[in-house]
Amino acid sequence: MPKDKYIEIKGARANNLKNIDVKIPQGKFVAITGVSGSGKSSLAFDTLYAEGQRRYVESLSSYARQFLGRMTKPECDFIKGLPPAIAIEQKVIARNPRSTVGTSTEIYEYLRLLFARIGKTYSPISGQEVKRHTTEDILACTRQYSKGTKFVILAPIHVIEDRTLREQLEMYMQEGYARIMQKGEFIRIEDFLETGDENSENKELLDASGEELTQMLKEQNREIFLVIDRASVSDEKDDISRLFDSAETAFYEGDGACRLVFPPSNICYDFSTRFEADGMKFEEPTDNMFAFNSPLGACPTCEGFGSVIGIDEKLVIPNTSLSLYDGCVVCWRGEKMGMWLKEFIRRAEPYKFPIFKPYYELTQQEKDWLWHGLPSEKDREPHDRVSIDEFFRMVKENQYKIQYRVMLSRFRGKTVCPDCHGTRLRKEANYVKIGGKSITELVEMSIVNLSAWFRNLELSDNEKEIAKRLLTEITHRLQFLLDVGLGYLTLNRLSNTLSGGESQRINLTTNLGSSLVGSVYILDEPSIGLHSRDTARLIKVLRELQELGNTVVVVEHDEEIMRAADYLIDIGPDAGRLGGRLVYAGPHSEYPTTDPAEQQALLEKYPESHTIQYLTHHETIDRPSSHRIWNRFIEIKGARMNNLRGIDVKIPLNVFTVVTGVSGSGKSSLIKGILYPAMRRKLDLVADAPGEYTSMEGDVDAIKHVEFVDQNPIGKSTRSNPATYLKAYDAIRGLFANQPLAKQMGFTPQYFSFNTEGGRCEECKGAGYVTIEMQFMADLTLTCEACKGKRFKHDILEVHVAGKNINDVLNMTVNEAIEFFSDEKNQLHEGDFDFCRTIVSRLKPLQDVGLGYIKLGQSSSTLSGGENQRVKLAYFISKEEQAPTLFIFDEPTTGLHFHDIKRLLNAFNALIERGHSLVVIEHNLDVIKCADYIIDLGPEGGDKGGNLVVEGTPEEVAACRESLTGQFLAKL
């Protein structure tokens, strides 16, 4: 390959990279792999992306640069042949309550434009299309009749405010008009004026003006029209020209309105250049009319959120498996309030209301009767009606009594906006339709159904021409969402309810939709949250991106994606200071084959590459020879949150349970939405309301704690670090305070903290650096001149333990610290050994979970999502005496290499051996095959998911043909 076809990186030194030289082929699909902490992200993001972004920003004017993220030059000698770079990282894209899948992918923006351009407005009264008429419409109307048919062109008489009808008619006569039409009769204007002197009714009319005249005509049910012209249907050019002129005149005189009358039957047709119908004025569609983030389009009641504070249905009816008779309506329980229930049942009898049917099985009409009143209630006085709405109206009226105020507060919460019904838009937006559907109906459809609807959409040639570009953008983006396995989502799904994997794939779709060419796309584990079934689809999407003319670089651990890549770069061999070297770089042709001789040659050539060892199956994650036997369990019955279909699930205790299923099958709903909050409430802890379920049975009391271990940062402050999180730093400070010099100087453990005043450097507040804002350039981060980056005052740094001061210890990696504090050769003082043992015991779990490479004082903000999760795991392992706990992990293998997964499984086993229980949501087959018990949900995502497909040991799941997870397990 010619030299210019490579992106050449020389001397990369970011973080732990060891001055490496890397060549990345342009226009190819490249995978960067390696164990966690080996330096993959340092190469891909801190070097490649940072330089690509910096060069782009540097090319802009200084004025534009002040509004953009300012980036420093990465640590490397040079980078050649680098195109503009785009990074798609692992992160939840939005916590904004207004952000949706539609707005994140920009599909909604194109939908808004589509409805503004070709949407047709329909009257909610008659259902007829509302449009501005032109003279062409009048010509088309006349052509319904045979040639020679006579007709009259009329204009409704428009009288301005300070002029009477008499004055207006006299003005018409001066302009040359001779007749008017009223009550189906043609009358000369002068005759009408003369009769006005004799007829008192006409006299009042002639002397009226403006609003008064309009009101009188309305009361008398009269209409008066000015006769503009009389003509007959003809194809002659001159006649058509005359018709157009007369029609224009009629529109002018009639203030935008015109009428055609065909005598003698007097059939009439109304036309208007105003946007109105059925006596209603309509707003012409604009893109802002469909924007819930704009005051022009947002529902005025909920301001575009779709929900308001009101009576929350989930609080009134928390258990939808109960029937009305069984007391599903909580506020109608008890002797006094129960009278409402009895009265409703009595009145509902003629309508055959199913009082014994569970609430969730009621039809929408039956729910409306219960909430808003039976049909017969409309004739009754408000105080004599019986419904949930009327009940709370009564409660509000009695708010001056304390018990009613308390009751009202119990049932208040977020509820669907009563005006827009959760659509977030003004009602006028729903009058505009394309193909019989409004924009709110389209965003409520699943992406699978929406894509099919657009494929079958029939438009006129003119509409196709107008919408051509918009439809292309919409259909391409919808197809991308389908290709990455998100067909079960809807466009109005809130972004802050998506999982990390879903968020990243939506982020990917947004970038794919822009169809840039000649760029470098750098993706951080795009396979997160993807079932093995969907990986092939993801590879297809990445290939499409590459075929546009882009270089696609993925930081990835998925074996299938590694094998699909054109070029593999392995950074390692291990993590932290033991990593940062290039241990393998080669094209697809060099990948491991099934030939043992070739595999052996590859292993000998690249002995340090863990990736090659796993790809050649030289190293493997072994399936356990047996599974733990369990006899205690928690059983959730009737789980119905989101798409769960009332399933009953047993979750065994004291074993390793994995919940599997394709993306959108209901895993998070079951575990994060029901199990976790329900268990917290059982333990009297603060928790969100759990999703719907009938009951939780079994050995619930056997669990004393519940912990949800996610990938959020371990500390809210950038000052938080692994040593403080695992409480090892308390012992380190105690050790330094125990030294003779510290005692002599009166230094307590507080003096060795960089978070409190006393021993820390006050110039940089213990950070070791100061930040200087530079308006047009990247902010300068300078080493603090007072402490020279050592974070503490000089006299604090004089205190040593075995030749190391507090700053030296904070700069040690976990592995170095364990080695240092375990070294028996260190000359320690009385009492120091206890501190050292405590430090080692608290740091050892970090080493066990594969985080031996991170520094003790490393800011938590620099840790990846997977690293944060493993720090939390290490914290729980370090807690010696802990009551039986249920641990819930959400995709703990994120960011983990095969080599790291082995350690993770060992850590899981350590927790179970201490009497704890593990529930893990996971797609990684190496983890799934090691489980004691699998709960597989599906079979598909969204509407086609939510069922319990199979539960049992990995062998039992592998034998189930209906299970997609089982099919992949069977291949192992």
Residue ranges with predicted function:
Residues 1-972:
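Conserved phosphate-binding elements of NTP-dependent enzyme cores
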